[in-house]
Design a protein with these regions (language model features):
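Short, basic/aromatic-enriched C-terminal tail that caps enzymatic domains
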Residues: 4-10, 129-150
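Conserved acetyl-CoA pyrophosphate-binding loop and the N-cap/start of the following alpha-helix
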Residues: 87-96
Length: 159
């Protein structure tokens, strides 16, 4: 599998999926993040499998993470960005976002979006702004299958 790596001092950012420590990612997201608290390991694993992941490492230890959900043509969602507390203040989060946004497969997209409660200044540095016309945007929060209506029944087709 083809992957990219970036080096800065003793830190590396890599898109190599085999290098990701899914247990460490799950631990942070499910217990320390405000946006994914309580998320199951299986859900984290599925999210990573269906995204472009960026692992941040100091030596062999994973110390941060980001992922991009995209169609690689027009749209990308930057999600689950974090750096462990003990490594903050070194510019690693800024570097992680910079590398993610500059990835060769993510250039010339029409729109990037993200959600944040506390890192507005970080993302403003990269050109993100608050939504100017929120009346154009909607979202749907789905607590789980119990609140999701059954899909319409498919009818025949094909040959």
């Amino acid at each position: 599998m083809v992957y990219n790596e970036w080096q800065r001092g003793d830190c590396t950012i890599s898109t190599e999926r085999a290098r990701l420590d899914l247990h460490a990612i799950h631990e942070f997201l499910s217990t320390k993040s405000y946006w994914a608290r309580g998320r199951s390991f299986e859900l984290v694993q599925r999210a990573v499998e269906n995204s472009l992941p960026f692992g941040l490492y100091r030596g062999a230890r994973q110390i941060g993470f980001a992922r991009v959900v995209t169609d690689y043509a027009t749209f990308a969602w930057l999600a689950d960005v974090y750096v462990l507390d003990e490594f903050r203040g070194e510019g690693l989060g800024k570097w992680l976002v910079e590398v993610t946004l500059s990835h060769s497969e993510l250039q010339n997209l029409r729109r990037w979006i993200l959600g944040t409660r506390d890192a507005h200044e970080l993302y403003r540095h990269f050109g993100f702004v608050e939504v100017e016309r929120p009346e154009f945007y909607m979202h749907r929060m789905d607590a789980g299958a119990a609140s999701t209506p059954a899909p319409p029944e498919a009818t025949g087709g094909g040959e």
